[in-house]
Structure formats: structure tokens, C-alpha cells
Amino acid sequence: MTTSTIEQKDENEPLLATADQVSALIESFIELGVLVHDNQGTQQSHTALTHKTNQVISQLSGLTSSPFTHQFPIPVDVISYIEDGRNPDIYTREFIEVTAKSNARLKGKMKAFARLRDVLGEKLGNEFPRLVDSIDDIKKRTTPEE
């Protein structure tokens, strides 16, 4: 049901258990939707619908009372995506794209300021030769190590 996989490690066991509970809950919701859609109004369909509704309630209760559930906070934006019927993986992809663009913009600014520092330092060194040592010290302290 999910598009990503969680690596089987000891520290991931709570996350795997929660993911399994959520997957089972999603399946129950799908089955409940089918039962509601195909409801014929008979006693048998009413009993099946009641049973499935009670199953969903118990699964929700189990998920809520699980000690692992509160370990993994879910962003409100993801919940909004799900409520709007959208795929939460789209939120993740869009978030990564926005972050990548922001990082690229910041990298460009850093390069521009580094170039400004170098050009300004060179011009100041040409005009004020006695400041060359201070300018070189500033350049050395403000140049990131790679």
C-alpha cells in the first residue's frame, strides 16, 4: 500500500509496527467503503456493516493507545493532504523540491558574498596596503572549509 519501505532494523521496530497498523486501518476503511456502497438494506448487510465499523473503531483505538504512535509526529500539512484526498508522498516530494530550490538560492548568495568579499578585499588592499594582513585574516576566517 505504501510507496516507500522502512528498513528492518531494531530501532525501526516501533515504526514498522505503526506502519502495519496504519496499513491495516486503511484496508479496513476501503472495505467499509465497499460495504457502505453495496449495502442492500438487509439484516445480513447491516450485520456486516456493524461488524466492520466496530473493527475500524477498535483499530483506531489500538492505534491511538499504542505507545509508539506518539513517538513519530506527523506534520499538520500531511494530515491536511490526506484529508483532502491527496497522496502524502506528493507533500514529501514538494517539500524536498522547495528545500532544494531554497538551498540552491542560499548557495548562490553565499558564492556572491564570497566573491564580493574577495573583490572588496582586493580593492581595499590596493588602496590601503597597510591593511593587507587584516584583510587576509578576514578572508581566512570567512572562507568555509571544504
Curated annotation (Swiss-Prot):
<dbReference type="GO" id="GO:0006357">
    <property type="term" value="P:regulation of transcription by RNA polymerase II"/>
</dbReference>
<keyword id="KW-0804">Transcription</keyword>
<comment type="subunit">
    <text>Component of the Mediator complex.</text>
</comment>
<dbReference type="Pfam" id="PF09748">
    <property type="entry name" value="Med10"/>
</dbReference>
<keyword id="KW-0539">Nucleus</keyword>
<dbReference type="GO" id="GO:0016592">
    <property type="term" value="C:mediator complex"/>
</dbReference>
<dbReference type="InterPro" id="IPR019145">
    <property type="entry name" value="Mediator_Med10"/>
</dbReference>
<comment type="similarity">
    <text>Belongs to the Mediator complex subunit 10 family.</text>
</comment>
<comment type="function">
    <text>Component of the Mediator complex, a coactivator involved in the regulated transcription of nearly all RNA polymerase II-dependent genes. Mediator functions as a bridge to convey information from gene-specific regulatory proteins to the basal RNA polymerase II transcription machinery. Mediator is recruited to promoters by direct interactions with regulatory proteins and serves as a scaffold for the assembly of a functional preinitiation complex with RNA polymerase II and the general transcription factors.</text>
</comment>
<keyword id="KW-0010">Activator</keyword>
<protein>
    <recommendedName>
        <fullName>Mediator of RNA polymerase II transcription subunit 10</fullName>
    </recommendedName>
</protein>
<dbReference type="GO" id="GO:0003712">
    <property type="term" value="F:transcription coregulator activity"/>
</dbReference>
<keyword id="KW-0805">Transcription regulation</keyword>
